[in-house]
Each structure stands twice: as C-alpha cells, then as structure tokens.
Amino acid sequence: MNRPERLQPGVKLRDADKVSRIPVKIVPSERDTMLRKPDWLRVKLPASNQRILDIKQALRSNGLHSVCEEASCPNLAECFNHGTATFMILGAICTRRCPFCDVAHGRPLKPDAEEPVKLAQTIRDMKLKYVVITSVDRDDLRDGGAQHFADCIREIRKLNPAIKIEILVPDFRGRIDAALDILATEPPDVFNHNLETAPMHYRKARPGANYQWSLDLLKRFKERHPNVPTKSGLMMGLGETNEEIAQVLRDLREHKVEMLTLGQYLQPSKFHLPVERYVPPAEFDELKALADELGFTHAACGPLVRSSYHADLQAQGKEVK
C-alpha cells in the first residue's frame, strides 16, 4: 500500500488536491448539474475599485492575509470599499480539509512572530474602529494558535486604544483549556466561533470537527467572561432542513450564545460541496423571527450574510441582511 505523499511546508493544496482524503468523497460538479444562482444573490460591484486596491496593497505590503480574499467571500468588494476587512492570522494554509471552504490546505509554516505588530500598524494606518481577527486551523500548534491571537489583541490595543476587537476562532480541538487560559489574558470584545451547519452534516462538511465540542467552547468562554458577547454562524444550502437549523439555534441559546449570523452557502469551485438549494429570503426572515423569539440579542439572517459581514453594525445591534 502506497503511503500518502508527505506535505511540504508552505505548499497550498486547493480544489481536488485539498479534498482528496476526506471521509465523504466529492464528485466534481458538472456545469449542467449546478444550480443556477437566483437574482437575490447577484452582487453589485462598486463604481470605483480604488479603495479595494488600496486595502489589498496595504495587506500585501505587510505580508498580511484577509479571509475575504482567501475564502472568496462574495462581499469582498462591498466590505473593502467601505474600508473594512477581516484579517486572517497564522498564515493562509489550514490543517483541515473542510470541503465547503476555499482556504488552502497543507502543512503551515511557523507563525510569523512579527505579525501582531504588523497587524496593529496596518489597522492604525487604515483608521479602523472595529476589526475582526480570524485564523486558519492550526492543529500543528500546542495551543491551536491561541497565544498568537492574544499577542495580536495586545498589540492592536497598544496602537489603537479605542478599537473594538472581535475574534473568530477555530475549535482548538483537544486544547480548549489551554486556549481559554491564554485568551483570558487578552479577552476580545466579541468571541465568535462558527458551528457552520447542523450536526448530522458534520461528517461531510466539517471532517475533524465535533458539534458538541464547538458548543462547549462557546459556553466555556462565556462562563469565564460573562460580559463578553458570544457569537456563532451557520450556512444554509448543504442539505439541512429548516427544522435542523432551528434546533441548532436552540442549542446555541442553551449554551448562552447571544449573536447569530445565518447565510447562504456558495460553492467555491466544482471540487467543493455542491449547493443543494438556494434558500429564499423569506425563509431567512422566518429563521430570524425564531432567533429573536429565542432571545438572541442580534441575529443577521440573509442570503449574503457572512460571519464578519458588517460585524461592527452587528455588534451595535443594527439590522444587517
């Protein structure tokens, strides 16, 4: 039996190379079998792209990454044009192979010790008042990357004392206690961890993750930091039912999660999980009504909503769709 080829540090695997060894095999989609994108998912491009180019240049010049680009977010033009970005720390190579995600898989390089300072300087230069920091999964690190998150928060606040910081963290598989101990030294203003989908779809969508583990991470952070809002996000269109999503909302509230994002899954390439249906806006409205009824302090529900989409407005409790 041939052994899998050893991954070389820093090499990005995408598309078929990325999903070749996940539990549920994906047959590449044929163009004539892919669902036609409905009109409500059409994104309007801004009249000018100068602001977009300026932000991309600021990221490149400091060796930084945005999840907006790495994950092919449909809202990139809108967010960049408004001068906001979600920064992705710890490199652009993930140790997981989630087949809904467009971030590359591989063997990551050692964390950049200068990244926290460069990130803080870039945020200062961009004059941001609210920033979202996320990361790839780093199962290769003893703390899952928690210390790097804490270092980034500390350096950002040094140069930007009035800023609000939201972190969107991985699940810290097998190292929750160590990660939470570290994050307690530099707690964020909002703590976000995405469940992504209903539990019965984890095997195909989130190989290596565990639904209950993710819920416990959110609850245990809240127990340590009762005044810091907790937040989670979900996608629709992966084969789940609305009732399954409704049960996830109930589970989130039982685990003291206060903020919610719910959006439409979009297939990044033919090698990723196919979209099984496009959820009409009216169904998102129904789920938002349920979220409000369950007691979420803020629920952003709509086809183009993403976890960090207008995160500053979400944190202020303003309507986002």
Curated annotation (Swiss-Prot):
Belongs to the radical SAM superfamily. Lipoyl synthase family. It catalyses: [[Fe-S] cluster scaffold protein carrying a second [4Fe-4S](2+) cluster] + N(6)-octanoyl-L-lysyl-[protein] + 2 oxidized [2Fe-2S]-[ferredoxin] + 2 S-adenosyl-L-methionine + 4 H(+) = [[Fe-S] cluster scaffold protein] + N(6)-[(R)-dihydrolipoyl]-L-lysyl-[protein] + 4 Fe(3+) + 2 hydrogen sulfide + 2 5'-deoxyadenosine + 2 L-methionine + 2 reduced [2Fe-2S]-[ferredoxin]. The keyword Metal-binding applies. This is Lipoyl synthase. [4Fe-4S] cluster 2 binds at C94, C98, C101. It comes from the Bacteria. Pathway: Protein modification; protein lipoylation via endogenous pathway; protein N(6)-(lipoyl)lysine from octanoyl-[acyl-carrier-protein]: step 2/2. Its EC number is 2.8.1.8. It is found in: Cytoplasm. InterPro entries: Aldolase_TIM, Elp3/MiaA/NifB-like_rSAM, Lipoyl_synth, rSAM. It holds the Pfam family Radical_SAM. Coiled coil: none annotated. [4Fe-4S] cluster 1 binds at C68, C73, C79, S308. Residues 80-297 form the Radical SAM core domain. Its main location: cytoplasm. Binds 2 [4Fe-4S] clusters per subunit. One cluster is coordinated with 3 cysteines and an exchangeable S-adenosyl-L-methionine. PANTHER family: LIPOYL SYNTHASE, LIPOYL SYNTHASE, MITOCHONDRIAL. Its cofactor is [4Fe-4S] cluster. SUPFAM superfamilies: Radical SAM enzymes. Keywords: 4Fe-4S, Cytoplasm, Iron, Iron-sulfur, Metal-binding, S-adenosyl-L-methionine, Transferase. One of its GO terms (molecular function) is metal ion binding. One of its GO terms (cellular component) is cytoplasm.
